[in-house]
C-alpha cells in the first residue's frame, strides 16, 4: 500500500511524521474524506473547497494549489488501484521545535500533507435496514464548522455508541440537536426534510448539501433550522448522512423505535435521488438500490 507524504508516494511502512509536528502534538490541522465510485471522485471540488476553507479559518496555508493537490491524489488512487473507496487526507501546520502553543511569527511553518486511499465497498444492507442511535450531550468546541483534527469529543461519543451497539451518537446542546459524532442528522416531519442550519455548531456535510439540493429539485420541502430532542423523537422518519454512509435510516433512538422501525418512504426517495447523482458523476453502481 502506497501513501502520500507531501508530494511523495511511499510505502505505508516507510511513512514517517516528525514527533514535533503540530498536528501530532496539538491536533493543529484540517482534514477531508473524499469518496470514490468506479475509480472516480464524487463531489471532489466541494470537499477540497471545504478543506481550503477550513484551513483559512485557522490561518493555515496549504502548500499546494488545488490543481497540484488533485494531481497528487489521483496518483495515490491509481497507485493503489482503488475502485470504490475512501481517500483520507490531512494538512497540519507543520513542525515547530521547540513545542509551543503560540504559532511562530518570525518564520512560516511548512504545512505537512498526508493521505491514504483504501478500498471500502458500499454497505447496501445498512442503507436499507439502518440501525439504532443513542443521544449524547454535545461537549465539543464551538467551531464545529471547521473540519479540524481535534476530534476527542467526537471519539468519546462515537465510542459510547459503539459500546451500546448503536450506529451513531446524536449530539445535542441542551434540548437542541446539532449533528452526530461522525455524520449529520435529519428528520422528516409531515413531509418536510428538517436539518440543522449550517452554522458554527455543525459541519456542513457535503452529503448533507447534496441531499438538500436533490430534495429541492424533486419538490420535497426543506427546513434548515434548529430542532429539539422532542422533535427528533416525534419525527416520522430519521436518517443520518455522511460521505462514507451515504443516507442511512435510523430505526431506534435510545432504544425507542422510530415509527415502524423501517426506512421511511421519503428517506428511500432521497437515497434514490442521491444514488442518481453518483451515477451521473461516476457511472453505474453495481447492486445500487
Curated annotation (Swiss-Prot):
Keywords of the record: Aminotransferase, Pyridoxal phosphate, Transferase
A GO BP annotation: carboxylic acid biosynthetic process
Positions contributing to substrate binding: 31, 99, 101
Reaction(s) catalysed (UniProt annotation): D-alanine + 2-oxoglutarate = D-glutamate + pyruvate
One Pfam match: Aminotran_4
Disulfide bonds: none
UniProt KW Transcription keyword: no
Cofactor(s) in the UniProt record: pyridoxal 5'-phosphate
Gene3D superfamilies: 3.30.470.10, D-amino Acid Aminotransferase, subunit A, domain 2 (3.20.10.10)
EC number: 2.6.1.21
Molecular-function GO terms, alphabetical: D-alanine-2-oxoglutarate aminotransferase activity; pyridoxal phosphate binding
CDD domains: D-AAT_like (cd01558)
Cited SUPFAM superfamilies: D-aminoacid aminotransferase-like PLP-dependent enzymes
Domain of life, per lineage: Bacteria
Active site: 147
Binding site for pyridoxal 5'-phosphate: 50, 179
Enzyme class: transferase
Transferase as UniProt keyword: yes
GO CC annotations, alphabetized: cytosol
SUBUNIT field: Homodimer.
Cited NCBIfam families: D_amino_aminoT (TIGR01121)
Role, per record: Acts on the D-isomers of alanine, leucine, aspartate, glutamate, aminobutyrate, norvaline and asparagine. The enzyme transfers an amino group from a substrate D-amino acid to the pyridoxal phosphate cofactor to form pyridoxamine and an alpha-keto acid in the first half-reaction. The second half-reaction is the reverse of the first, transferring the amino group from the pyridoxamine to a second alpha-keto acid to form the product D-amino acid via a ping-pong mechanism. This is an important process in the formation of D-alanine and D-glutamate, which are essential bacterial cell wall components.
Designated name of the protein: D-alanine aminotransferase
The organism's taxonomic lineage, starting at the top: Bacteria, Bacillati, Bacillota, Bacilli, Bacillales
